[in-house]
């Protein structure tokens, strides 16, 4: 007699042929009627299962597919971030909002991985954010004069470079400082500047990361100094630019990838070569001063379709009010922004390498790792370290479930199977599951029975020997009991007592002499910082004076060249002047 699964999977046409050529006995009729009733029940159950799966597939199809973001990390940097994070947690200086691997890495790089200086910088950043309400500045602050400010100070983001970073452009030659300060105030402009940075971190950088499928937290800057009047620009630079630079350096460090200063004259290049010696080599390597022939340099890093036409690109944005008003970039794509707001993307370290990008993008979602810290030293990670085998099993089971759901949704959305084939497949899978469950249950039952028989056999075999020779059993039990090991515990207690006495002998507070030394060193550091600020201002003033002298020198050259081109010789000109 055929098996039950074979009876259920026989097509109707084959059954019709068997009726024509084979006489059916009574026993076979009973088995077939039972199999048909069982088949009807299985079809109903499979229909319910397929309907629920189809509904689920439709719900998932309405969502946007998650995207994998490649996250490359250096082993040494990761260790430094772990140490820095532990220090912040111990000092209660790590809010959940800033519990991010890349944020902490930027601050460490800004202080050259000096832990004490980085902790101090982090503490000052948190204090500054609390005093100025930066955490809610996107919702609270409304900059109504934005359009007027754009007229007198054209600036903004436009497109991305070839590596996916946002491109920030400023046209300093178009600045009118007098009208700009009439339209807005210095404090409001600085708050607008901070709000722009917060939007960059919450919208632009995540959108660029999703579009490029790699983590991005820095930008490329282009500053056009064509037509800059340094006489009118001096006061604005002292008040506005210096304060903006301080805000950026103290609270948003390491966000500049490369800066290109274009249309720079000879005077600016002369001053830059002088000032460059006083700056950090790492900072100067990011700044490139270019003249009028800048187009080839910009096209090496930015695609022509992403570069505005006035900078040598092909983008015009005429229907959107110009390139500086359109704010072109991935952050204007509604699908990408929906992923950003729902956090439906996943960071994948490069060393993982589970699947290809397209396959992993269909299977995983950030909702499983949303609020966990991207640095690998969180509480959840410590639990994984304590139970590595359990973590591997859970990861493999999650991957298997995700693969099954992804395949089922893909087959349901692309090419639906016929009803008979779907029923047959569902029946085979259900029967396989039932068979595997029964096999496991029987094996477990047999194993437990064997174990019970072994235990009972040992008890039966040992019982008469113990009854015949009770003295031997008592002696053996006495021999098996080990003597109490008190000596090691006593030694450990003595060691602990000595350690406690040593700690008690130490003073509870720092001596007054050391406190005075620390205060003196802090006062010296503050005075040095003040002197540095003064030297910065003096350098800026001398630089502006050098630029003025260079411009005057160029004007004198032009005037002397026009005088030399005159048709009258010098003695004739003197003769004309005397007459």
Swiss-Prot record:
Which parts of the sequence belong to the CRAL-TRIO domain? 145-319
Q: Which UniProt keywords apply?
A: Cell membrane, Coiled coil, Golgi apparatus, Membrane, Protein transport, Transport
Q: Which Pfam families match?
A: CRAL_TRIO (PF00650), CRAL_TRIO_N (PF03765)
Q: Which SMART domains match?
A: CRAL_TRIO_N, SEC14
Upper lineage ranks? Eukaryota, Viridiplantae, Streptophyta, Embryophyta, Tracheophyta
The primary site where this protein sits is Golgi
Q: What is this protein called?
A: Phosphatidylinositol/phosphatidylcholine transfer protein SFH9
Q: State its location(s).
A: Golgi apparatus membrane; Cell membrane
* Disulfide bond sites: none
Chain positions covered by the region annotation Disordered: 372-419
